[in-house]
Amino acid sequence: MDAAASIALEDGAHRVSVATVATRAGLSRTSFYEYFASSSDIVAELITEELESFSAFLEEKVRDVTDPSQAISIWVSSSLEYVADGRHLLAKALSAIEISRDQSAVIGMAHRKMLLSLSEPLAQLGVVDIAQALSLIHSATQSATTRIESGADSVREIENTRNFIVAGISTLSRS
């Protein structure tokens, strides 16, 4: 896995192949196939691992926060700081690689898991449609992620996105 991640970050995700990963890892291609059926399998596994790490990071940030609005605010800020400081680069690099529908479903579940730590704070705030709120939060943070990765001022993006989401959640909790 480390070999594939290094290749993706150093040479680009398009260079992640059975041959390059096996060579970098010091394995024969036959040995590689004992672990993964294809290069897209290793790409999907790398993305899933990255998202699981990201999710654990976010869960840790909000674990002991008792104020639900503060938990949401910290989650948004932390998720975008993670992007701004470059820890999201591997997932970004790998996202351009074509993967199977099953692999996409696994990655989609990992993305949704990242948002789960917000379910309880949203419920505590009286948000009725938690799924809608999570979808809106995801959309806003994804937009900010794209802007940060395109060179926008990360401090401003984080602050504006956090304020936008907190205000939006406040509105949802009143409706």
What is each PLM-predicted segment?
Residues 91-95, 104, 108, 122-166, ...:
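Hydrophobic/aromatic-rich alpha-helical bundle segments in the mid-to-C-terminal region
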Residues 61, 77-84, 93-98, 164-169:
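Helix-loop "lid/cap" segments that line or gate small-molecule binding pockets
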Residues 3-8, 50, 79, 141:
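Short hydrophobic clusters on alpha-helical segments that form packing/core surfaces
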Residues 8, 36, 41-50, 93, ...:
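Alpha-helical DNA-contacting segments of helix-turn-helix folds
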Residues 52-55, 74, 82-85, 100-135, ...:
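Amphipathic alpha-helical packing segments from all-alpha helical-bundle domains
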Residues 3-41, 45:
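Helix-turn-helix
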Residues 45, 59-85, 137:
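Hydrophobic alpha-helical connector segments
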